[in-house]
């Protein structure tokens, strides 16, 4: 949904959540007209359980959830995508090689090296 709107040149409204780990904050964002949220997993106090709860709620109410992670971490990327996150942001990607690694971790073969989960 978000990708298509951006591709079509539409303006999308979103925000970053850095402090509030209560999943129902997403309902407030959705009711306020937001189309996506970015959960700050780099500086915020969130753990995988909170990410999973927020992603599940976002999916159920039609709010895209992206997660900012601290760095290039195959395990974290795989878990977030398996949870159903709509995407992720990674700070300090400085080289083509680093960007290519992120793509490989995010996509299934033959375009990438993402493993297959038994639940997704």
Indicate residue ranges for each PLM-predicted region.
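N-terminal amphipathic alpha-helix/helix-capping segment at the start of soluble metabolic enzymes
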Residues: 1-16
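Glycine-rich, proline-tolerant flexible connector loops at the mouths of alpha/beta enzymes
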Residues: 24-26, 30-53
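Surface-exposed amphipathic alpha-helices with a cationic face
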Residues: 3-7, 30, 55-59, 103, ...
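Short, acidic/polar
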Residues: 17-32, 71-79
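Alpha-helix-loop-beta-strand connector modules within alpha/beta enzyme cores
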Residues: 48-82, 106-111
């Amino acid at each position: 949904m978000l990708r298509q709107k951006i591709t079509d040149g539409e303006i999308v409204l979103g925000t970053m959540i850095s402090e509030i780990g209560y999943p129902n904050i997403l309902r407030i964002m959705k009711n306020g007209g937001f189309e996506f949220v970015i959960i700050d997993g780099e500086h915020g106090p969130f753990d995988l359980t909170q990410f999973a709860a927020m992603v599940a709620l976002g999916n159920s109410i039609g709010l895209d959830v992206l997660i900012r992670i601290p760095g290039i971490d195959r395990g974290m990327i795989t878990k977030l995508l398996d949870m159903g996150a709509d995407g992720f942001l990674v700070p300090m990607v400085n080289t083509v090689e680093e960007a290519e690694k992120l793509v490989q971790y995010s996509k299934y073969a033959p375009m990438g090296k993402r493993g297959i989960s038994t639940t997704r």
